[in-house]
Amino acid sequence: MLTLSRWYGHLLNSMMTAAGILLLAMTVMIGADVLFRNIGAGGIPPSNELSEDSLYLITLLAAPGLLRQGRHIRVDIVLRAVPQRLGWLLEWAGDVVGLVCCLLFVWYGASVAAASFFDGSVSIKTLVLPEWWLLAPMPVAFALLALEFGFRMQRLASAERGPRDDAVSAS
């Protein structure tokens, strides 16, 4: 299990690197679009659409790695206010709810992407793309998030009985 967790960590780091590169490319594209419009060269027509799709992909690429590192949005003031054992149980409850939600998104995302693929649906904006290209990353990202919730539960089971210390607390 430790080897799988280590391999998975490398995968998530690679995905976060890809998200950073995509963010850089999007920033350069937006800057170039503004520059071209200001000098009268007409801009980059699909820049808005590419920016929208990039933000979506950046989110899906970065989310599993951020969850693993404890850098996701987390309000843990209640966990710090209750007894250690109850905080630990609430951590479990949060992880179970997160796992179930992610698995539902995997199922739903895969269903929608498959339906789009078999129907031949097309997204027509500035660019014309098969719709499933935009939908396919969602179930993959949520499957990785579900796997991370599994690893989180494994780490929680073997840790001291108390809330995690992997987040910045308001207390």
Regions found by a protein language model. Give the residues of each.
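Alpha-helical transmembrane segments and membrane-interface helix-loop junctions
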Residues: 1-171
